[in-house]
Every structure is written in C-alpha cells, then in structure tokens.
From Swiss-Prot:
Residues noted as binding coproporphyrinogen III in the record, renumbered to the chain: 119, 135-137, 284-285
NCBIfam families assigned: PRK05330.1
Similarity comment text for this entry: Belongs to the aerobic coproporphyrinogen-III oxidase family.
Protein purpose: Involved in the heme biosynthesis. Catalyzes the aerobic oxidative decarboxylation of propionate groups of rings A and B of coproporphyrinogen-III to yield the vinyl groups in protoporphyrinogen-IX.
Catalytic activity: coproporphyrinogen III + O2 + 2 H(+) = protoporphyrinogen IX + 2 CO2 + 2 H2O
Pathway: Porphyrin-containing compound metabolism; protoporphyrin-IX biosynthesis; protoporphyrinogen-IX from coproporphyrinogen-III (O2 route): step 1/1
Enzyme class label: oxidoreductase
Keyword Mitochondrion included in the entry's annotation: no
Organism, as annotated: Dictyostelium discoideum
Record text on subunit structure and interactions: Homodimer.
Protein name: Oxygen-dependent coproporphyrinogen-III oxidase
Keywords: Heme biosynthesis, Oxidoreductase, Porphyrin biosynthesis
Length: 332
C-alpha cells in the first residue's frame, strides 16, 4: 500500500531525517543540563559493508559520594545531571544479510540490506529523574522494508501526574501523525509497549511504558512522517523531568534504591531486548549495542522494600495501567 497524497521518502531523506533527530536531541540535552556537560563523539565505519555511525556518549563524574550531598545536588547547577547516556545514529549497508538475521526475518542470506536509525538511553544521577529510552529505525532488504521504534520511561520515584502527562504527550503525537489502519495509534503502541517491556521472571514491567512499534510496512510516506515526529517528540517528553526533577534533593537510601532498580534494566536488555539480540546476531558494533547499559547498578539477594515507603510505591506502577484515565485524586 502506498500513499497517494505524499511523496514516498527516499533512502537519503530517511537517513538525513534520523541524523537531524540525533542533532536536535543532543542540542536539547546539552542546553537543558546547563551547557557544561558535553558528550564525547565517536564516528565509526561499518567494516562489513559501507556506512557507519556517530555515537555521542555522556559519562558523568565518578567520585565516590559526589552525588549524595543534598545541598550540592539541589543548589549547584553545574552538577552533572547525566551519569551515563548516549544518542546513537547509524546508517549501514551490507551485501549479505547475516544468516541468523536472515532466518529471523525470513529473507535470503545473500540479500543486500540497509539499516538506519537513532537509539538513545539516558541514565540520570538523580533518582527523581527517570531513565528514558527511545529508538526510531528503518530496515530494508530487497523488496522488504519496515519502520520501527518507540519510547519508554523507567522511573524510580514516579509521580502520577508526570506519568499521565508523558502518556498524554505520546497520545497527541499518535493522534496527529498516526493512523489506526497503519497500526500507529496510541492504543496499539501502548499495548505493544506494555507487552514488550515486561520481565517475566520478575512479574513486572520495566517501567511505566510508552509506545512500541515494529515491522510497520504500510504506507511508507505516512509511516515515515509518524516515526520522524515520534523521534522529535523526545524533547517534549523528557524536558519536564530533566528540568523540574533534577533539582530535587535525594539521600543515600534513594541512590541505593536507584542502583538496585537499574539491575532490572540490565536484566531486560541482556535477556529479552530484540535490538540487543539482533545487534549481536548481525555482528554489529558491540560498543554501540551495549551503550544502553548504566554505568553502575546493584543486585541485592531477595530484597523487598518496606511497606508504605516510597520504594514500595514504585511497585504499584510496574504493571499495565490506563494512565490517561487515572483518577487524579489519587496522585502520588
């Protein structure tokens, strides 16, 4: 199915669009974190074909106890806000699809393929600022093509009104640029996200969800417009958390709980994440694939937070909920 109203995007337009998304998000992160915390840039070449990528990575200071001083954290605007983060752009072209990936996608192994997109993860220092992940991508092999992507939020100390606003912003993007017939509606994307970002061995979701889309292959022009706008929406989605929550003081208990909860993030990425599996199977760039992992995390044996604590409150958020219809009288 093709659109009769809009021109079909070219490979070059899609590539340049993703690069623009990376640039805009990086500008936003630098400005919003005060301008002093810069990323390191790593340009790399795809050795098994042509193309490559640009990885932009933030790694904060590592002094022990540096981010446990409440007065410093709440008053000094020069404090690093991103402990570990990255915004990666890639565009690769190969002449032979790796056999493992070919089997997964039911494509002949000797088929030329193109893969491009932007992937990002931000792990903040402050436990009151959620971790966020976003991915927008395009894949083409022979006559087969599709778009995919999504965004999801992983808070440690969630506030209901902020979670509702996050989902409201996502719904606005879907209402304006998505289509039910193109499988890019908010309802479908949210349901897929709740299902995908689930840890079966823990019986909980990774966070408070968001949107997840994969193998979108209907109406290339409209789907590209949706994916492009979804990528740019990151700024509106994350700005309230980064601006409003970074100045909230926190103590050692909260920092320790943040590190403990990050272990769930690592478990999901290494055990279940399709992007990680595909990257490894397709002999992708390991540094870029594992960029999403936090700098520090902890596991505690059989740990359970005490009842009626902010730490226990998080667990009530880690299940699929109809966020847009939550009772605002029960704000946390």
């Amino acid at each position: 199915m093709t659109s009769t109203n809009e021109p079909i995007p070219t490979e070059e337009e899609i590539k340049n669009g993703f690069k623009f998304i990376q640039d805009e998000i990086c500008k936003f992160l630098i400005t919003t974190t005060g301008g002093h915390q810069q990323y390191s840039e790593d340009k790399w070449d795809y050795t098994k074909g042509s193309g490559g990528g640009i990885s932009r990575v933030w790694e904060g200071k590592e002094e022990e106890g540096f981010y446990l001083n409440q007065d410093y954290q709440s008053q000094n605007n020069k404090c690093d806000k991103i402990e570990k983060g990255g915004v990666n752009f890639s565009y690769i072209v190969g002449s032979n699809l790796p056999s493992a990936a070919a089997t997964q996608f039911k494509i002949a192994p000797d088929t030329k393929y193109i893969a491009t997109g932007v992937s990002l993860v931000i792990h903040p220092y402050n436990p009151n600022v959620p971790t966020i992940h976003m991915n927008v991508r395009y894949f083409e092999a022979g006559d087969v093509w599709w778009f995919g992507g999504g965004v999801d939020l992983t808070p440690v100390y969630p506030k209901l009104d902020q979670v509702v606003e996050f989902h409201s912003t996502l719904k606005k993007v879907c209402d304006q640029y998505g289509q039910e017939e193109n499988k890019t509606s908010y309802a479908l994307g949210k349901a897929e996200c709740d299902s995908y970002f689930f840890l079966p061995h823990r019986g909980e979701t990774r966070g408070v969800g968001g949107l997840f889309f994969d193998h979108l292959k209907s109406d290339k022009a409209k789907t590209w417009k949706f994916i492009y706008q979804l990528g740019l929406s990151f700024i509106d989605l994350y700005k309230p958390f980064l601006v409003n929550n970074s100045s909230i003081s926190y103590d050692k208990v909260q920092r320790e709980y943040q590190l403990y909860r990050r272990s769930r993030y690592v478990e999901f990425n290494l055990l279940f994440d399709r992007g990680t599996k595909f990257g490894i199977l397709s002999e992708g760039r390991t540094e870029s694939i594992l960029m999403s992992l936090p700098a520090v995390c902890k596991w505690k044996y059989n740990y359970k937070p005490e009842e009626n604590t902010p730490e226990a409150n998080l667990l009530t958020f880690l299940r699929p909920r109809d966020w847009l219809n939550e009772n605002q009288e029960n704000k946390n």
